[in-house]
Amino acid sequence: MSDEIVLKTEDLTKHYGGVHALEGADFELKSGEHVAIMGDNGAGKSTFVRQITGVEQKTRGRIWLYGDEVNFAGPLDAREAGIETVFQTLALADDLDVPDNLFLGREMTKWNWLGPFRLLDYKRMREATVAGLERTAVKIPNIRNTIRNMSGGQRQCVAIARTATFHSRLTIMDEPTAALGVQETAQVENIVRQLKEAGEPLILISHNMRQVMDLVDRIIVFRRGRIVANLDRRETDGQDVVAYITGAKTGADYAGAA
């Protein structure tokens, strides 16, 4: 893990009218680092991610990606800049199969001898899909099934495999194992470990304390829209994290943290 700053935010803030969903978030993520964001529902975790990825436009603040200040107009801009995100809503196309979902917006093409327009190369996309699923140990019985005909767990695994297939500059996972079974959760956690081994930085939003303690380097705690703690995972425990989440413990370094 190097000292290169992958992502930095300064005074990142989002207001919805009189509701201060996110207030003054200062955050840094280093190259190869895996950071968890924790907090109760409504604490500001997902709001923070939506500002970074361009899903929403911030009220104020600044964002840098690898040293360049960015202001994404939408999620597509963020993805083109190298940010791969697994949202809670998955963002999958129900009527498309697995290869079409993995390559949606970045389809492989081949030369068309009959005209000036290139053709979709379905064979290469299917082969790349199988290779990507094998590499991430995600088991999908039939990749030609549409997403609509898959279980919730299979859908989640497809969304995460899509993220892991394309080596990103930054991966963000928002509750990636929510409502998954034991086996599917293990598959997702295996993907996270593979990203770590590859040196790819990750932001993980999770309520799963066991998972967080097993997978990340550092834990950021949000409470009432503010960052209240920045904890080295090796120097803390679940009880300490919960104390910050509930407000039983406050971060002296963070104004308005109580």
Name each region found by the language model.
Residues 2-258:
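Glycine-rich phosphate-binding loops of nucleotide-dependent enzymes
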